[in-house]
Amino acid sequence: MFTELRSKLSPPRGRAGAVRAGFGERRDVDATAHFSFCRTLLEHTVSAESIPCHLPRTPGTSLTWHDSRSQRAASSRPIKLLQQPGTDTPQGRLYSDHYGLYHTSPSLGGLTRPVVLWSQQDVCKWLKKHCPHNYLVYVEAFSQHAITGRALLRLNAEKLQRMGLAQEAQRQEVLQQVLRLQVREEGRSLQLLSQASFGKMS
C-alpha cells in the first residue's frame, strides 16, 4: 500500500531529469547572453576612449590657464626708472618732460636744443639767420676761435674785439643778438624749473 502511494506521489525520474536538464540549459543561455552583452559594452567603451580628440582653438576664444599665465608673465616685467637720491621725480620722466619742452613748446621758437649744446656749425647757422649783413666776417672770426654755443653766451665787446671785430657797429650787432639769446635761454631755464617743481608737488 505504501509502495503504491509513494509511486503515485513522486514524479517519474525521466520527467524530473528532463525538467532539471531544461532548467540547466536555460541558465546556460542566460549566462551566455549576459557575457556577450558585457563584452559588447566593454568593446564600445574602449573604442570610444581610443578615439583621439583634438579640439582646434579658434581665434578670439579664451586662453587656457597655461597660456594666460605665460602671457601674463611676459607682459608684467617691471620697468625701472632711474631716480636721483633725495628726489621724488624719476630721471626718465624729468628728461622726457624737458625733451618735450624743447621740441613742442610754441614759445621757444624753432630751437630744438639748448644753446649750451650747440656746435660750431649751429653757431654759424645762428649767425647767418640773425646777422646776415656781415655774415662772412662773423663766420670767419667765430670759426678761427672755435666758438660753440656755450662760448657764444659768454661773449662781450672785449672778446669780440680780440677775435678781430674792430668795428664798433659789428660788435654791437653781434652783442645785441647774443643778449636776446641769453634772455631766451634764461626764460627757458625758468620754465624748466617751474615745470620740475610742479611735477614734484603733483
From Swiss-Prot:
Residues 118-184 form the SAM domain. Transmembrane segments: none annotated. CDD domains: SAM_aveugle-like. GO terms for cellular component: cytoplasmic side of plasma membrane. GO terms for biological process: cell surface receptor protein tyrosine kinase signaling pathway. It comes from the Eukaryota. InterPro entries: Aveugle-like_SAM_dom, SAM, SAM/pointed_sf, SAM_domain-containing_protein. Pfam families: SAM_2. This is Sterile alpha motif domain-containing protein 10.
